[in-house]
Design a protein with these regions (language model features):
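Conserved acid/base catalytic micro-environments in cytosolic active-site loops
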Residues: 1-207
Length: 207
């Protein structure tokens, strides 16, 4: 079945990674993209505006019970878990998971429960293991899984943990993820493309 949602999880180095990814997606991109970027309680409220400067797609922090719309980028608010329920968002102040709130695992698990095999999960650079369990849940439901190559990530711990937990469909450098997403959404229901090849990213990005 064609994909209906993309969920992305990242931590250390994630802002630069998200800039690189979002600036490579056109305004016509057809799916909603939901992002968990680990950040502290005192982080800047303007993160969605900051990322919006690099994106052709509108970027915002969703409110509780807000419907999910195609062609938007949704960023988990600081200090809230972001879940998907009945094609809408739900915000939770449940305790942190893997020392994180928002938690990648929480978002990914809820997306897998809601959209099943119509989910694409993406793990980018990061410094802990949050997201590995959630990505495994997406794969177990028949969804597609993409992990940034730990060798080219700013911080390889998070992608490496995901690879240890499951066998992702693709392990690729950061700059190849956006083209892969375009291929996966351009011809819906088509045969899965092979992992693209290309030069590795330099290790110069920071959060």
């Amino acid at each position: 079945m064609p994909a209906e949602i993309i969920v992305i999880g990242t931590s250390t180095g994630g802002l630069k990674a998200l800039q690189t990814l979002l600036c490579s997606l056109p305004a016509s991109f057809p799916l909603p993209i939901v992002v968990v970027q680990h950040r502290g309680k005192a982080s800047d409220d303007g993160l969605s505006e900051f990322l919006g400067d690099f994106s052709c797609l509108p970027v915002s922090e969703p409110e509780d019970k807000q419907p999910i719309l195609p062609g938007y980028v949704y960023l988990a608010p600081r200090d809230y878990h972001l879940l998907i329920q009945n094609c809408s968002f739900a915000l939770s102040t449940d305790p942190p998971e893997a020392f994180a709130r928002p938690s990648i695992d929480v978002l990914f698990q809820s997306a897998a429960d809601e959209f099943q095999e119509r989910t694409i999960g993406v793990i980018l650079t990061g410094a802990n293991r949050d997201g590995a369990r959630g990505l495994a849940a997406i794969k177990s439901r028949g969804g597609l899984t993409i992990v940034e190559n730990p060798e080219t990530a700013v911080c390889g711990e998070l992608p490496a943990a995901a690879i240890q937990r499951l066998a992702p469909d693709w392990i690729v450098p950061l700059h190849e993820i956006a083209p892969l997403l375009l291929k996966l959404t351009e011809v819906q229901g088509a045969e899965r493309p092979a992992a693209p090849e290309g030069a590795e990213l330099a290790r110069h990005y920071g959060s």
